Amino acid sequence: MSGDLGAGQRARHRDLVPAGGYRSEEFRAASRDSPAIIFICPYGTSISTLRWAIRRVCRAGYHVMAYETTTAVFMAADPAILRDLISAMRKDLESQISRLRSEGVTEFGFFGSSLGSFILYNCIGDAIPALRWGVFNTGGDIAQGMWRLDGVRRQHVRHGWSLPRLEAAWADLQWPQFGRLDGCRFVFVSSRRDTIAPLDDIAPYLGPMRQAGAQVSVLEVRAIGHLTTIVAGLWQAPRIIAMVRPGQGVSRPWSGRRSARRRSRGRP
């Protein structure tokens, strides 16, 4: 499920900003004023690896601004890197959104997976008001999820970190002040069998978003672990994006949990 986009459908941004720890690449839709999707890859995954998923979103009629992030965000065992990464990416996203607006784009959504989901969780509301709808492809507690990655946990232990210290260091990122989210629409994609970011871990984070005015739902997918949960969400990305984009129509209530398990049978 890989391949390349044709000439003229993409524009590359090759320069990696060392202090920011990310790289971006733009994939153009056929129409200049098509909605734009901010797409952030999972931890340790490159844009080229997920070109197949990006291509599916482009074919559905969206510009895609894709990002990949440095593995140092976890492997360097320095919690400040995540904070700096989020700050740097916010600034870049604001710049890219401003540029796209000047080119005629008026709608902006997002699709973030795993670490990418958490970064975007810290970019909604007052942080970047233009992001009013989008998909969190897995979600939960960033410190607990990272601690479940054996290699990353060992690296942090070597540097004197414990889970409680990490939770304290990232508390303000885990519980951001959104401001008002009136009219915003978001969905979390998850699986009961995801051992890194389990479905049941999402519930505590729905309340603050709803209290801020957002419509938030949880979509359960059929998977056997964290990676397959991510892939299931990526495979269904065009349909899931349509669920949250205003004016696309949603057939079920937004207050509860939905399941895509039967619909995705036979796929990752």
What are these regions (language model features)?
Residues 79-103:
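Alpha/beta-hydrolase active-site loop
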Residues 111-120:
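Gly/Ala-rich beta-loop-alpha elbow adjacent to hydrolase catalytic centers
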Residues 210-268:
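C-terminal catalytic histidine-bearing segment of alpha/beta-hydrolase fold enzymes
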Residues 121-165:
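Hydrolase active-site cap/lid region
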Residues 146-207:
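The feature captures the conserved acid-bearing segment of alpha/beta-hydrolase catalytic domains
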Residues 1-31:
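N-terminal cap/lid segment of alpha/beta-hydrolase-fold proteins
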